[in-house]
């Protein structure tokens, strides 16, 4: 502690990082941010009834409130939040999944597998938070440590055995999970994303690696790594001297691996090999990369003491994840998938897989988000141009950027893009794609996945790709007889 003032004997009612959530007696942490700095809201925090404030900067002249300056407010926040909520993480088994792609599918599938044995498990991730007795929409892939500790308290009080977490690179860099010990931590893969935040790929990888090397405050009980990914293989080599390590993949040297894959638009069938035994699996998740996601979840379950080969029926029964290769059925004579793919690697995975299993053409609607990594935009366009026979580039979430500027970045210096149209209105682009699709074709609408809104500057409007597809197809069929 660098200094403190005021009376620190007051009883604290809650721990918050957003002044709008303050109730009388709150302990407010003023955290720096990319868009707003918590230090700018100190007066608001006091006016709303904060009893104490912790800052990372020297602050003077705060009336009638306890204040302290600390060197690392985020790490102090994580420790204070755990203490305030009575260390609920000690009553839970924690699993964390990090990586560019696959976090949502792996964590959701893992929860499904673990609950197959009758236990209740919580879930923290991009789509929803399942807290034991209730489920709420997600507001951040990995929330701030103050929220996380509160969610763990709800899970523990509801009798959950543990929690399955998606752990983002932002969360690791910002110490949101610092000091939480993960019984199992897994790495899926690493490809370009979030360079606008991290600066370069080495910094991005370093953020992910913090979950495994102790910089997060704790080493995981078991590290689970994808050895089909070169970064995962390197992490596995680094993790083995530190503690228990398991690997998965298609590689022959993986501890848990898949062979004899058969893929189509309905899913996958494959053999899982584990400790000298084999079991045939069927999954409704489409694509070889989803086989990797299944392997990751099975290996994490094995790290928790489950027999992964005994989970074949549970994998077959898994209904999938909203907006992750989610199939929309509205009577059309061709498959339509909604997917969250928003990097060039994810698009290549999805489109490349569909090219291999689709008898007709592969069609794609996609866009690039505003106020995010501009460098990946031409690479995303190149991926779609290489693999989709017809494509419509359109608005994703433009946010505060002009769509014209986003389109210019997407075109880059790629030259002519035959078979690709740039259509500003996303609904119109989806309509054109549906009109162009024929029996035998396959359409994937990429980028927004489970999202139900679209962001323009300071405006958020309702927009759900799945619902838009249904509305357009229903309008073309006309009124029911």
Go through each PLM region and give its residues.
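N-terminal leader/targeting and accessory segments in enzymes
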Residues: 1-79, 83, 230, 254-259, ...
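ATP-dependent carboxylate-amine ligase
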Residues: 1-11, 21-27, 33, 37-40, ...
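Short gly/ser/thr-rich secondary-structure transition/capping motifs
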Residues: 5-15, 77-80, 143-146, 165-172, ...
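Short, well-ordered alpha-helix to beta-strand connector turns
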Residues: 12, 25, 50, 64-65, ...
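Short internal beta-strands
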Residues: 51-57, 222-227, 365-366, 389-397
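Acidic, Mg2+-coordinating active-site environments of NTP-dependent enzymes
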Residues: 55-64, 158, 173, 181-336, ...
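Short, active-site-adjacent cap segments at secondary-structure transitions
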Residues: 60-62, 128-131, 171-173, 230-234, ...
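Phosphate-binding loop of NTP-binding sites
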Residues: 76-227, 233-243, 295, 301-304, ...
